[in-house]
């Protein structure tokens, strides 16, 4: 996550509401001297702002890290709906900064805007946490509380986004420009620290702590909510130390009105008798000053280059949705640590901290020494290509995962597994209505196999005839089956005879890295088995079959079991990621219950570490595209237009999330094909952007009405420097 994108307040390092960038307004009151931090040139008030930002980023990213799995496993939405709502929320977080900037510029000022919208932010966390308490109402109430909470959070985080960093910049005197430069570096580090820590911790709160016998989403949302309360309290504590510039007018609104007036005026004066004007924006000259029109002209040249950018964000922001769902189907055991699927996102902020200085101090300098003109637009194009490669790698990983997933029966098909609990080998023959053998198989006693036989039906539902041979016994049974289901035929001795029962199997690999288990009780007593904080699992006597129960991956050496007159312990051993187990309780010994363990569906075998290459590629793409993009944009835009440019940049991110939302709902593609689609779309967009960049003529500083010398952002490692220099590409 870099200082400009992927985080909602990272983009505010050059704020749309900076007082330095506004058109001339009413004179500001003289700035008062503020106490310094430990005798330095830093205002003491900066400490409150930096701590506030750390807590707010912890709050936002901590909540967002577990959001997709909350939709999937708490609200029980499907993957497409979960992805769509996730990106709709992300998109809303990028639309609301325009509202926050307008409120701060035109009405309340930055300080009051941060305070009031932080209260809205906290209220959103309250609703979100209440919507994650299982005993509070039903699914409808949980959904309503969650959506209301997310809407308030989007308004809060987006609204304060364009204000916090700029408000910190307002605290410095003009003669302390170097200290202000270091402030932006510290501010950026606080953002990534909050993101890094929260993305690692909140999945642990969700998965390792149990609430009401389930994953503790209420705690995973509640702790970020408390951090937002802390952020608000800390920020308010510094109130008397802050410099609070008054609102000076909304430049975004002025630019919008100027463009709209020019368009309307042009259409009102379409007569051939009226002389044409050199540029379509010149039609605003009747109402707006020349310097504003010149600035808007410079702005539109850059906005034209922004047209292809949303597709890049469409790929980048899927780390928290589609890539988390992919990690959900992989083996998180790294040997020294078990990684939760939603913890993989922690790689992004960690790699950003490594890559920004690496690229700036090593890679870019080496390329420069080779005599290659690696311009800003070329860096952005290479960033797009790296994102394409990241999704191509993600597609390959998805294909590999699909090859390991247990297949599902198609139309007019069933899968059948025979489980032999007798003392010797049995022969099974399955026949259809036409007495044609669908299956002939010999099964050893207690044979552990994950093999399912595929049987073709004549209709959607059908009666099948089972012929069992055991020693000198021959038994015939008839069972009804339905298409697209998996079944287990359980065969066992019954005195001197042979009995069987057909049990419907789940046939589906447990999601979220969970383990699914069920029991067959061969004893003559009913049994209750306590696996977790939920109600005990009941298993009837004499080959009773329990329901499936999903539990966390791990070791279960002493599971509590009860009959009506005794208590036992049962060692289940290691239960692995994504596995379905059957335990057949066979007898009682001095050491407790004895059970035979069968693996019906094998574990997730592909390590989650295989996602590392795609995360490395997409983070490198983010550093090259996002950091460079704003550096280029700000070097090419007049200072009065930087706020509008910031709003436009955020809008490209919002549109990118909308693209993902649309594709998730309407593409109908399998996941690996969707990854390939996004990769190909971005490749096409990259070619278009490259052509646009080839014909782009850098704007000379002399071509702007402003002075030749101006402040433009310069990125140096993870430092954000405001240097005075000529505007050159």
From Swiss-Prot:
GO molecular-function term, one example from the UniProt record: peptide:proton symporter activity
Alphabetical list of SUPFAM superfamilies matching this protein: alpha/beta knot (SSF75217), MFS general substrate transporter (SSF103473)
Region entry Extracellular domain (ECD), spans: 402-611
UniProt family annotation: Belongs to the major facilitator superfamily. Proton-dependent oligopeptide transporter (POT/PTR) (TC 2.A.17) family.
Tissues where this protein is expressed: Expressed in kidney brush border cells (at protein level). Highly expressed in macrophages.
PANTHER family: OLIGOPEPTIDE TRANSPORTER-RELATED
Classification of source organism: Eukaryota, Metazoa, Chordata, Craniata, Vertebrata
UniProt cross-references to InterPro entries, sorted A to Z: Alpha/beta_knot_MTases, MFS_trans_sf, Oligopep_transport, POT_fam, PTR2_symporter_CS
Residues carrying Phosphoserine: 9, 28
Residues carrying Phosphothreonine: 12
Quaternary structure, from the entry: Interacts (via extracellular domain region) with trypsin.
UniProt entry tagged with the keyword Plastid: no
Domain of life the protein comes from: Eukaryota
Keywords of the record: Cell membrane, Cytoplasmic vesicle, Glycoprotein, Immunity, Innate immunity, Membrane, Peptide transport, Phosphoprotein, Protein transport, Symport, Transmembrane, Transmembrane helix, Transport
Keyword Cytoplasm in annotation: no
Record's function text: Proton-coupled amino-acid transporter that transports oligopeptides of 2 to 4 amino acids with a preference for dipeptides. Transports neutral and anionic dipeptides with a proton to peptide stoichiometry of 2:1 or 3:1. In kidney, involved in the absorption of circulating di- and tripeptides from the glomerular filtrate. Can also transport beta-lactam antibiotics, such as the aminocephalosporin cefadroxil, and other antiviral and anticancer drugs. Transports the dipeptide-like aminopeptidase inhibitor bestatin. Also able to transport carnosine.
Gene name for this UniProt entry: Slc15a2
Organism name: Mus musculus (Mouse)
Activity profile over pH: Optimum pH is 6.0 or lower.
Positions of glycan attachment: 448, 472, 528, 587
Topological domain ranges for the Extracellular compartment: 79-87, 135-139, 205-217, 317-343, 402-611, 665-674
This protein's name: Solute carrier family 15 member 2
